[in-house]
Regions:
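Local cysteine-cluster metal-coordination motifs and their immediate loop/turn environment
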Residues: 1-2, 77-79, 99-129, 157-163
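Short Fe-S-cluster ligation motifs
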Residues: 27, 34, 122-126, 130-167
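FNR/FR-type flavoprotein reductase catalytic core
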Residues: 1-103
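Short acidic, glycine/serine/threonine-rich loops at helix termini
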Residues: 84, 107, 135-136
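Short secondary-structure transition/capping segments
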Residues: 14, 63-68, 94, 116-122, ...
Length: 167
């Protein structure tokens, strides 16, 4: 949303395509409408907007001759990967906003390490925005699962002190 707002404020024509799993998860619709010249809402299940994923109207618009100077994609890695797969054959510049785990903000911990253009980059200092054609999404998605067990444990764990009765 802040990117769309900033682009609109500088006079850029903004086409927004936002996607959600279902109607209950739709957020910031009014805010997007306020800064987009055109807004397309997609829901996986068709309960709101058009049924499908964001790449569907994106490809339709490109095939119909829409002349996008740039596509900016922000969201889940799998979605960004497929946005890039959609725009690349048409050579539409695509910027992805990567948001891996960032611990220290200096690149020292390596938690936000990515491969971009065959080189190691750190989202916290080199990004978070990168040329989508250069990002190794498969590696990024694999790295995103590294802490899955720890995260599950953190959600399920209980403090033993809370289990004791107060004397």
């Amino acid at each position: 949303l802040p990117v769309a707002q900033a682009l609109k404020a500088q006079g850029t024509k903004v086409t927004g395509i936002i996607g959600f799993r279902n109607k209950d998860l739709v957020i910031l619709e009014d805010e997007f409408r306020a800064c987009c010249d055109e807004l397309i809402i997609m829901s996986d299940d068709g309960s709101y907007g058009q049924k499908g994923v964001v790449t569907m109207p994106l490809e339709e618009k490109i095939k119909a001759g829409a002349n996008f100077d740039e596509v900016i994609t922000i969201g889940p890695l799998i979605m960004m990967k497929f946005v890039v797969k959609t725009t690349k054959p048409y050579n539409v510049k695509t910027v992805v906003s990567m948001n891996p785990i960032m611990v220290d903000g200096t690149g020292m911990c390596g938690g936000c390490r990515l491969t971009v253009g065959g080189k190691t980059k750190f989202a916290c200092v080199d990004g978070p925005d990168f040329d989508g054609f250069e990002v190794d999404f498969d590696e990024a998605m694999h790295r995103g699962t590294m802490y899955r067990d720890f995260e599950a444990h953190a959600r399920e764990a209980e403090c033993n002190l809370l289990k004791k009765e107060v004397e």
